[in-house]
């Protein structure tokens, strides 16, 4: 899972891209980068670390231009090295090009092997580089046609921004697995970003979502853009965006992430009634669902677990050893609130079980008498291959254990999940979603 942003025909584009990336830091913490186009020349700065670690005022001042694309990296393909930061910039027959990508290509190894057999030399471990090579090795006269031809050869989930010396292309796969939205900046320029929370920070107005299978073409110096439906749309936005990844203040496909998460809590409360003194969220991602649960159940809401906000997300850390330590560093329950109490604990998901087990242990040590664990999504039973880092069945506790076995493992007094139908009800039944982590329907093959 990554964040991408494009700033088109706007003064100080790099600085605007920087702020947009900062607002989407939750989507990737391993690396960050920005490419700008100035007078037909593309310059790129990128590196490992948070947005604020990679960029400073001096760097941003050097990135001059009114066209920019940017990226926050969360590794799903490749390793966490400086080489694998995006954007990827290259020179080819039609000039300079830079590209950023959010998603995952399921046929990346097959495509890479074919390209290497044909003489291609790869500089990174990223599947994104496949697209650069496919574009460069095509002989069509126009970049637009080369991009479309390249996308015909890849399979997977992707949102792409491709920058040339004179144009920027925004593309979303036919399923629209990953979100991508279009907005208008105050100076008349455009912004394209993974989440609408970026629009709020930079003062942009939301226009619409980039449609599944759509390519939007922006030209340097022109106020209008061109919309092309390059693939037949088969919409299936990823349900996990609503459950966990997106910021609660974002809107995806017309749905407020915050309101969807509250609805998940309400549905949970209706299906799993239990007597308790408090409803306690696992912060921060469990808070909206806990509010919904408390509202529906009439059980008081308590922020009885304090989160250290200077510790990153446990789910997207590369090593299990680091995750174990970070749970303790990140969460601290309040004994003064919890001692002798029966509580309902709400979390957005159980992936590996690491965090849930630690949370229950911490709550027991804080004096909680009964712990009823409620999860605002179904059991994660299948690896997600479209941009979320769950590469094997072995890492998914619900792939190997029943609900009762998971309950026993994490040490809770009771455990309930939303069903798939209840998840659909919470988001809205009017469209299809990517539910591959829950139902194993790998619709991109």
Each model region followed by its residue ranges:
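A conserved beta-strand->alpha-helix junction
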Residues: 55, 124, 129, 301-312, ...
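Amphipathic alpha-helical
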Residues: 130-141, 283, 295-313
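PRPP-dependent phosphoribosyltransferase catalytic core
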Residues: 166, 203-209, 361-445
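Extended, hydrophobic alpha-helical segments in both membrane/secreted and soluble proteins
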Residues: 279, 286-293, 297, 301, ...
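Short, glycine/charge-rich flexible loops or terminal/linker lids adjacent to PRPP-binding catalytic cores
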Residues: 298-344, 354, 381-391
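Secondary-structure transition/capping motifs at alpha-helix termini
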Residues: 120, 141, 273-276, 295-302, ...
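Flexible loop/turn segments at secondary-structure boundaries
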Residues: 76-77, 107, 177-178, 199-201, ...
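Conserved short alpha-helical segments that host acidic/polar catalytic motifs at enzyme active sites
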Residues: 1-212, 217-276, 282, 370
């Amino acid at each position: 899972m990554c964040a991408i942003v494009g700033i088109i025909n706007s003064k100080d584009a790099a600085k605007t891209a920087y702020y947009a990336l900062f607002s989407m830091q939750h989507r990737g913490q391993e690396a960050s980068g920005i490419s700008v186009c100035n007078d037909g020349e593309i310059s790129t700065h990128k590196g490992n670390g948070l947005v604020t670690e990679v960029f400073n005022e001096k760097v941003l001042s050097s990135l001059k231009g009114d066209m920019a694309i940017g990226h926050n990296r969360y590794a799903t393909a490749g390793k966490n090295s400086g080489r694998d930061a995006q954007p990827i910039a290259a020179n080819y027959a039609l000039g300079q090009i830079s590209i950023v990508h959010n998603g995952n290509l399921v046929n990346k190894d097959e495509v890479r092997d074919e390209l290497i057999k044909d003489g291609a030399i790869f500089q990174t471990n990223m599947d994104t580089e496949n697209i650069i090579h496919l574009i460069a090795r095509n002989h069509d006269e126009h970049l637009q046609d080369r991009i479309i031809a390249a996308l015909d050869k890849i399979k997977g989930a992707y949102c792409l921004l491709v920058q040339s010396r004179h144009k920027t292309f925004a593309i979303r796969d036919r399923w629209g697995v990953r979100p991508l939205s279009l907005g208008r900046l105050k100076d008349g320029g455009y912004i394209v970003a993974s989440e609408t929370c970026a629009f709020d920070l930079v003062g942009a107005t939301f226009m619409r979502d980039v449609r599944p299978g759509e390519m939007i073409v922006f030209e340097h110096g022109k106020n209008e853009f061109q919309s092309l439906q390059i693939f037949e749309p088969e919409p299936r936005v990823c349900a996990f965006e609503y459950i966990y990844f997106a910021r609660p203040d974002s809107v995806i496909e017309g749905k407020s992430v915050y309101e969807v998460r509250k609805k998940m809590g309400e549905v949970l409360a209706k299906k799993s009634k239990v007597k308790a003194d408090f409803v306690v969220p696992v912060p921060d991602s469990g808070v909206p669902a806990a509010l919904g649960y408390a509202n529906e159940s009439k059980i008081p809401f308590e922020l009885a677990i304090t989160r250290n906000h200077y510790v990153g997300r446990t789910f997207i850390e590369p090593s299990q050893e680091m995750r174990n330590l970070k749970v303790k560093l990140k969460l601290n329950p309040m004994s003064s609130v919890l001692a002798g109490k029966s509580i309902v604990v709400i979390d957005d998901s159980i992936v590996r079980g690491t965090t849930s087990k630690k949370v229950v242990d911490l709550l027991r040590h804080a004096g909680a008498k009964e712990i009823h664990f409620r999860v605002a999504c179904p059991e994660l039973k299948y690896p997600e291959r479209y941009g979320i880092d769950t590469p094997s069945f072995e890492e998914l506790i619900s792939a190997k254990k029943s609900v009762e076995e998971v309950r026993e493992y994490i040490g809770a007094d009771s455990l309930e999940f939303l069903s798939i139908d209840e998840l659909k009800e919470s988001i809205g039944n009017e469209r299809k979603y990517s539910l591959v982590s829950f139902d194993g329907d790998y619709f991109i093959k």
